[in-house]
Amino acid sequence: MPRRKQQAPRRSAAYVPAEELKAAETEEDNLEDDGLSLDVQDSEYLYNDEHEIKETQSYQNSPISSATNPDAGYGSPFSEASDHLADFKSTSSKEGQDKEDGQSTENASYPTDSLAQIKAVYTNLLSECCWSNLALDLKKSNEKASPTTNTDKSSKSEASGPTSDPGTPTTITSSSCTNTSTSICVTTSNSAISNTASGYDWHQAALAKTLQQTSYGLLPEPSLFSTVQLYRQSNKLYGSVFTGASKFRCKDCSAAYDTLVELTVHMNETGHYRDDNRDREAERTKRWSKPRKRSLMEMEGKEDAQKVLKCMYCGHSFESLQDLSVHMIKTKHYQKVPLKEPVPAITKLVPSTKKRALQDIALPDSPEQAGISPGASVSESAKDPKAANPYVTPNNRYGYQNGASYTWQFEARKAQILKCMECGSSHDTLQQLTAHMMVTGHFLKVTNSASKKGKQLVMDAVLEEKIQSIPLPPTTHARLPATYIKKPPDSPTGSTHSEEKKDPEKEKVNIGEVEKKIKEENEDPEKIEPATLYQYLREEDLDDSPKGGLDILKSLENTVSSAISKAQNGAPSWGGYPSIHAAYQLPGTIKALQPSVQSVQIQPSYASSVKTMSSDHNALIHSPGSLTPPPHKSNVSAMEELVEKVTGKINVKKEEKVLEKEKVISAKPPSPMAKENKEILKPEEANSKTLKKHNEAEIQKPKKETPIESHALNGTEPLKAKVTNGCTSLGIITDHSPEQSFINPLSALQSIMNTHLGKVSKPVSPSLDPLAMLYKISNSMLDKPIYPTTPMKQVESIDRYYYEDSDQPIDLTKSKNKPLVTSITDPVSSPLRESALMDISDMVKNLTGRLTPKSSTPSTVSEKSDADGSSFEEALDELSPVHKRKGRQSNWNPQHLLILQAQFASSLRETAEGKYIMSDLGPQERVHISKFTGLSMTTISHWLANVKYQLRRTGGTKFLKNLDTGHPVFFCNDCASQFRTASTYIGHLETHLGFSLKDLSKLSLNQIQEQQNVTKVITNKALSSVGLIEEDSGSTFQCKLCNRTFASKHAVKLHLSKTHGKSPEDHVIYVTELEKQ
């Protein structure tokens, strides 16, 4: 219906002269037909709008929600009038009650009275625009109906008001009663206007509370104002409305108006009355208006406020706490907070006028709507308000779905709501979903699984039906999603943690049978399907598991699972290896090789990237469906779990890459390999156990360990040794070259070792260096057949020095020359086995030749090894502990550091109390240093600032300790001498430098170099006391890079390696031999 132009409202009868009243009566007679013709349409729009109000206004306890019937057909105009009376009849005003009584008696005594009398009564009673349709309805029925029906109608309409909701205290006075619908019904002297359902009048609502406190007679224009919601309007916006405000401003466009009427007309014409909370985020930023209370967005910033003032259920953000509270009360979302998602998102974005139809579509199967026909009669709807409004549920009379319907809705959608977003498993309760997330670590993987891995986790329909969550009771066995094979229905039965809790005594296995099964599977991977008929664990599965090792897993199952998930997902919160996750973020490459030693029962969806490999190779790696996965997984996963906890997977990666490379290089027939391996396994296990006992004995001899330490070593050592064997033999058995090799194992291993082996933080206790022990064991296991005749003496020397001060990663090359004692009694069983192991050992040698970490095995000069040019590394440990350079390798020229340290020491000022005060170096000294050393002034300033910061923060730095205590100790970086006073320290540094600091600005570089060659002899004599002078004692050696001189070739090589990072092959280039004088 087209919107009519709004005109000034009519005033109440108290202010209308008699002649105007008569003129209005005649005009209304002329417009009577128009008013009646609009009744049906008016009622339609009113009902639509009343439904919207029920959605947006729950703070008002209005009876409208239980008395109206928007769905039961529109019936007669009289039902509308009855509803209006029920909604807006006032019971709080004594004056209004008196008038109601008067009206009832008048209607009874003058049923056939003239229109003027009825008009006067209604004008005096209501004086509100919204009653005009009612008056016209009654007048029409008055003309056409009998006196009895008229009396019935009027009395019924009057009676419906006071009795509609006696228990609801209405806060509306008769003077301020108006239509609760969002349409504005303003009756003027010549028209009856009903706006279309475009929204309620904000500005009439703006004065509701003020009107409730104002007497009827004082209101100049009572018909302007609605009692509908002004919960969001601010009095500051308009000034104080009734204290002389001269302008009324539109909150959207800031247009100013002299009267509220004009502003109301403007608002209705332009549509500037819409609800802020339904605006889009982009539009909300254009708002200039402030909420009634002080805005949190002004105080905290918009982002912080939106994070705080946000509905946890639907995600709406609000400008003030009051807005959020109103929203919560209206929508009852505070009852639904624990679970997100159920509300259809479409209802948040559509206009309010269309929302009702969309809600009809959104929940067509709602139990509340069952059996309700649109054509229900008025009496039925009045008797059953719940049936009349399908959105009014027992717990909520204002329109949103909750209570019983919410319970039904949640039950219907529980499979989608309580669903793991990573693996797709559904759960019955939130607690089960939480337990599943914690056990599997999927809460970490959800955000970065698909995007970071570059692979989408494809879930087959059959697989989704088979997925079952990990239940809360720890004794039950659950299936895990077999996402790592190409044939989901043939997924193996993954064992959970509860399997690992079984008594290890039950898990005895015949190794020959195991290897036979692996061999059969290797030859014909397609024979595995019948074995998948059992979806749960059986006693046979437990019996087939290998013996030993699971008692350790009992204590580690929780920490290991979290460590694995964090290492795979790049979120390491555990200490020691802060950057370990970077190695596993190489895009989709390194992970492709992991499943050969993968722990399936802990990370079910971990192998989603295995899709890159061929199905044959996949089947071989995982052995799907046969009875051999339990032994394979128990052996290898036990190894992986411990290694991941201790070393962050560095070693497992190394061994995997070695095995994969060996497969690619030498693709030998699988059957003979498997047969030979049967002979290999038992001796190797015996050797590993012997090694374990031997190592533990050696640990306890030189070191006094606490029981906890020895327990840790006793626990982890045998498992590592044993399963390292399993890993090696597995690689030989499944000697099957993959069809597709997407990554060069050599480059992958190099990148990992380059990134991490140099960065692994040093162990706190040298006797508890699991990384070094694992390297030792794995390498000796690989190489033991190659050196079968090594004498016993070398093994003793290994064990004697192995657990001494090992503060750096072990030198992999050294262990190859010193095999185990038991290798003497274990001759090479066949050329095939020897060649396979030699391939592996050569691979390891090639990989570790350039990436050798620094040795942690001190030895004497007579015993040092020359393998792979590692002599310069060993000599570092031959020095006394004070000669070792700790911390990061410095790129500073040592001479420059000596100059800077000497200058800084000279700048210290001693106070009367004996303490030292730091004073800045003057610009002159900085210029001298800069000219001599070539360092920039900025670099010098940064070095000085860093030293001062360290001294202020900790009281010491590398060359100066205890400055804050008044008893400083100065350290010489060259010879580790200690000095108590700054002056002696400076004099000592000047002997190293070969010149005095005072002469720094006068000397040229050539003079200094010549003087250095002479004065460095004094320093070399100090070094000779350590016993490092080689046989060519008649000469000194000078470093060409920094012109420092050394007493021996070994010392200058050590200097080049430590200070300049030069390799031993390049030492000849940078060393100049000088004759001693």
UniProtKB/Swiss-Prot annotation:
Keyword check for Membrane, yes or no.
no
Biased composition annotated in UniProt, kind: Low complexity: 160-179
Annotated spans, Disordered:
1-110, 142-179, 274-300, 362-394, 473-530, 849-873
Note the DNA-binding span(s) on this chain.
885-955
Example of a GO MF term: DNA binding
ZnF region ranges: C2H2-type = 248-272, 309-333, 418-442, 970-992, 1037-1060
Question: Which residues lie in Acidic residues bias regions?
Answer: 26-36
State any GO CC term.
Answer: nucleus
Keyword set includes Protein biosynthesis? no
Residue ranges annotated as compositionally biased, kind Polar residues, are: 56-69, 853-862
Q: Which UniProt keywords apply?
A: Developmental protein, DNA-binding, Homeobox, Metal-binding, Nucleus, Repeat, Repressor, Transcription, Transcription regulation, Zinc, Zinc-finger
Disulfide pairs? none
What does the sequence similarity comment in the record state about its family? Belongs to the teashirt C2H2-type zinc-finger protein family.
What function is annotated for this protein? Probable transcriptional regulator involved in developmental processes. May act as a transcriptional repressor (Potential). Involved in two major neuronal regionalization processes: primary anteroposterior (AP) axis patterning of the CNS and segmentation of the cranial neuronal crest (CNS) development.
- The entry's protein name is Teashirt homolog 1-B
Organism in which the protein naturally occurs: Xenopus laevis
Q: Which gene encodes it?
A: tshz1-b
